[in-house]
Every structure is written in structure tokens, then in C-alpha cells.
Amino acid sequence: MIDILDVKSRATIQDLGRFGLRRFGISHCGAMDKLALRAGNILLGNAENVPAIEVPLGGITLQFQQDMNFCVTGAFYEMMLDDKPVFAYWRYQVRAGQILKMARAKIGMYGYLCVQGGFVLPQALNSCSTDLRAQIGGIEGRCLQAGDQLQTANDHILRSEIGIAPIPLRDVIRALPSSEYQAFKRKSQYYWWRNEWTLQSNSDRMGYRFQGQTLELKQPLEMLSHAIQFGSVQVPPSGQPIILMADAQTTGGYPKIANVIDADLGALAQVRLGSTIKFEAVSLQEAAKLRRKNEIYLDQIRRIVDEKN
């Protein structure tokens, strides 16, 4: 079991999300950086979909009530286990009574505290992920708060402490032109790929809002609501793009200029508020190769874990 002693961020329980329910209007949800969550679970010998604590930017203190292994992946935090500094992408042994403090993220946005065996929580629509709008999943569909107790499915077999290569963060996010790309003026197409974009403070798990050069359509475009997904880049009348994130709604009516490729969704999630990024066009073939590269990275972790366990 783990006791939450203090929380200063909107930390939630997340797994890989809800699959096959978007046609019913159910958001996918799940970890913002799914690659980081998968890496953490594999490092601990867990199934990839085991729920973890997603911590945005930092500000959580917790106490372990039993011996176990844990790791933190995703963002790079200032962390202390009692009075000893600990680091991201390392599997640590912890003893009952020890206290972990994740003070703040130095690099990146979302960290994933994974524990050996994962957390034991009731599922809502086949997932433990917290959906804050629907108020389902996790702990009563809400953010974690001081006093919460999280039951763990610990197998009581402590594994050696090992580290893995971290997932590199990016300030150039790769994307594909979307279905309405040709509806935008040529100069707006140029601006999208060539200019820098700043992530605004009103961004959240539903959507990342960027500020930059105004994107303009060739002519007014009336659209029926249509399916959208994590990574879709919508352009509302303001001309400032919104990239739909893990908690995004299932349909939308704004034209889309691009779609962030699957391989870079985690890197996009780790962009800090106020940071500036650029977008790079890739082909479908390149997108598939980059996705496979992520799977190779996870396969490498599996081999390391098999050798060290």
C-alpha cells in the first residue's frame, strides 16, 4: 500500500486508456505519454497497461507501506527517497516506511510513478484511467489528494536496481498533413511547418493550445462534426491551432491542418507550458518506421529486465 501525504499538482491514476468506446462518445483518456508509462511498467516486470500515478510538473509526497520496487519515467524530476536523491528511468528498491518526494519536474511535463505489480483499483469501462470530466476511473474519478491510500498488487519479490536509457524529449514534433490541409492558404501551410509555436498556459489534458502566426483558410469552410483523435490539429476561427490530447472529445467541427504522428505523441505531451516548438512533415512510411523505433526501444528494455531479474 502507498499513502499519499501531500499533493500540489493534478496527479491522477492513468493506464493506457479506454479502447473501442469512442463511437459511444467516451473519451480514450489514459496516460498523456503512453510510451513512458509502458517503459516504466516493463522496467518493473509489469503488464504494460498496469495503472500508475501520472504527475504533472511535480508536487507529490507519498509513503510506501511495504517493501517493493518502483520507478519514475517521463519527465525528469527532482526526487528524494528519504534523504537520498533518486532519478528517472531507474528501478529502485524501497522499504516499508520510506517517503518519496517528487518536488518538481526539471525537464518535461508528465511523470509516471510505477510500482511493482501496479495499483489495485476498480475498472470503469475496462480501464482504471481517471476521466475528470466524466468523473470515472482512478479514485472516484478525481485527482489524488492527501489522505488517499492506494492498494498495490505487490508480488513481494524485490528485483535488483537497474537503469535504462531515457526517452529523448523533442522540440521538433513530426506530423502528417490532415484531411483539410489543402483548404488552408499556401502561406498558412508554410507558417505551420516553418514557424515556431508557443504552448499556452490554458492547455490541459484535453487540448494543447499554441500561439503563433495566424492560420487562414482559403475561404470559409462549414463542416459537420466528425471523428477526431489524440494528435489531431484543429484550427478554430482564431487561427491559433489546438492539438487534441488524451482527454479530448470524440468529435469536432473545426478544420484540421495536421495530425501529430503516433510516435511523437509522448514527446508532444512532455512540452512545457510556455515552451516553443516546431513541426516537421513526414511521410506515412516514415511515421511507421518511427513507431517501430519506439517498439524496438521497449524491446530493449525487456531484454535488459530479463537479463537482470
From Swiss-Prot:
Its EC number is 3.5.2.9. Disulfide bonds: none annotated. Keywords: ATP-binding, Hydrolase, Nucleotide-binding. It is an enzyme of class 3 (hydrolase). InterPro entries: CT_A_B, Cyclophilin-like_dom_sf, PxpC. It comes from the Bacteria. One of its GO terms (molecular function) is ATP binding. It catalyses: 5-oxo-L-proline + ATP + 2 H2O = L-glutamate + ADP + phosphate + H(+). Belongs to the PxpC family. PANTHER family: 5-OXOPROLINASE SUBUNIT C. Forms a complex composed of PxpA, PxpB and PxpC. Catalyzes the cleavage of 5-oxoproline to form L-glutamate coupled to the hydrolysis of ATP to ADP and inorganic phosphate. This is 5-oxoprolinase subunit C. The gene is pxpC.
